[in-house]
Amino acid sequence: ADEHTTPARSIAGMGDHPCAMAFYGAIVTALYKRERTGKGSHVSSNLMANGVWAASVLAQAKLVGAKFGERRPRERALNAVTNHYQCKDGRLLILSLLNEDRQWPTLSRCLGREDLVTDVRFETKKDRHAQSLELIKIFDETFVTRDLAEWRKILDGNGLVFGVVGILDDIPTDQQ
């Protein structure tokens, strides 16, 4: 990838499922240890590391010569609410609205685009997917009006699921 390549869109649960397996194994092992020794254990896992582990299958496949189809550009994504967008400060955020019908009015309000809720082009999930190219353009124009920190407050404050594409400057303050 070059500097102009945007990140791949992730699938739901890409890190959550491996974390669940890691925690299951850690908890069962800790309980077994306690049963045998009478001593407890501290268990932990890491969403980021487990997400990387989950994606490692693709990396391994590539190492042995697998061929992958061309990735659809983000501007042509099939679903605008599970896509990434650039903020005013150049940072990228990734929307991940999996309960789209319920969250659509909230997202529209957060974007200051209440008009989208009643726009017949975007009335249903099916409509939004059919008009995803237009919706992506609208989102692009909207997200670029505020810095990432502002969008974080707005989206977090309204319970919308999103992620931030990390950069090296984030490492010292990353909670993971």
How would you describe each model-predicted region?
Residues 81-158, 162:
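Aromatic-enriched alpha-helical interface/lid elements that frame and gate functional surfaces
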Residues 18, 105, 149, 168-169:
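Residues in well-ordered alpha-helical elements
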